[in-house]
Amino acid sequence: MVAAFSSARMAGLPYRMGRCLSPDASWVSYERWNALTDKQQASYAPLCPEFLIEILSASDSLKILQAKMDVWMANGAKLAWLVDPYGATIAIYRAGAAPEVLQKPDSIEAGEPVAGFRLTTSRLWA
């Protein structure tokens, strides 16, 4: 079992000035989710997701999102994707490895911790 989140309600990390760092989409294992209190589950869960996706928007800075990805990885994320629809790239961040950048992939398949998850991306580049 898993707990998956959109940006409306998800896992996050305490961040500067009382703010919460939260990705556009995330995944947390059921075991970790159930270890939280009801109060923690009712708002931004104070934990780092095992898998997350950030999507660059027109109002975002790529450098700031790349720094945010480094924060996620330093805090225990196992896999993270940074999707840049303007540059037509997806940067794959894995624990203990340098990011791998894919140019205009038709799809991307995740490994652990979400083995079997596949995202079709070809429509992003059209």
Provide a role label for each language-model segment.
Residues 2-3, 11-75, 79-126:
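C-terminal interaction segment
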